[in-house]
């Protein structure tokens, strides 16, 4: 878990196409309007990604099971995600739970992430018997496979993740940020 002072964000510079200030504004908007589940129903290779700090040099490939959660003195969005630099197969060990939040006074941005096992994704890259064939479209295949996996992921009960999303949510609800 990381806690950032939001007053420091302008001094961090624009380290990514969506810098600290932009991520802060995106999170504020999301917490006001809520999360449209359809936003997390399809693979994405770029914006509009859900807010995520700290910045990593990859794109959010998907979000799943988004939910607004309140903690002792703030609220945020939790979701399951995966980041990649391209349309690579999602591997089980690279999927994680994240929570992105603000304290009630807006002074602190809270970011937490934990690995989770879903039981949906492979642990090794799958074989590709059609790779190299003239009509093979790797992006179309990636989109179709990941789309099916996201249907399963978004429908999966929270207790079927390891650790359970409910357990991680309870951990998040217990967080208290003090000056």
Q: What feature does the model see in each segment?
A:
Residues 1-50, 112-116, 120-121:
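A short acidic-to-branched-hydrophobic micro-motif
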Residues 35-107, 113-125:
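Signature of long, low-cysteine stretches enriched in small and polar/charged residues
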Residues 109-110, 163:
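Aromatic-residue detector
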Residues 116-179:
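Surface-exposed amphipathic alpha-helical segments
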């Amino acid at each position: 878990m990381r806690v950032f002072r939001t007053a420091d964000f302008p001094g961090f510079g624009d380290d990514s196409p969506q810098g600290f200030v932009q991520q802060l504004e995106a999170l504020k908007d999301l917490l006001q309007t809520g999360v449209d589940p359809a936003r997390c129903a399809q693979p994405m290779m770029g914006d509009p990604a859900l807010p995520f700090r700290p910045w990593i040099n990859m794109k959010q490939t998907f979000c799943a099971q988004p939910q607004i959660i309140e903690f002792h003195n703030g609220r945020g969005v939790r979701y399951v995600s995966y980041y990649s630099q391209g349309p690579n197969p999602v591997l089980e060990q690279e999927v994680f739970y994240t929570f992105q939040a603000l304290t009630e006074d807006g002074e602190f941005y809270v970011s937490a992430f934990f690995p989770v096992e879903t039981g949906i994704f492979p642990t090794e890259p799958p074989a590709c018997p059609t790779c190299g064939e003239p009509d093979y479209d790797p992006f179309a295949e990636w989109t179709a496979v990941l789309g099916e996996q996201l249907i399963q992921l978004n429908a999966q009960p929270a207790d079927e993740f390891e650790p359970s999303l409910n357990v991680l949510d309870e951990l998040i609800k217990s967080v208290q940020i003090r000056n």
